[in-house]
Amino acid sequence: MTARQIVISIPEKVLLAEKTDEESFAREMRMLAAVKLYELGRLSSGRAADLADMFRIEFLMALGRYKIFPFESELKDLEGGNA
């Protein structure tokens, strides 16, 4: 899969307030973007997982941390090996 790089300027104050380093903050931003785009229906769970740099099942399981619950049938399909 080819990837494109997008550069976003983050004020130093934000990193200090979050008490995190650039790499961790970037990883969290990718996850948050993936979750929101999935929630809005703009990305499928597979594409959102790609954005978050995760396997699809990992992404679906992680959604609960953000109070987003994927369709039960989607999880059952994955557990049954129909992904």
Language-model-derived ranges and their functions:
Residues 1-83:
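Small, basic N-terminal interaction modules of short regulatory proteins
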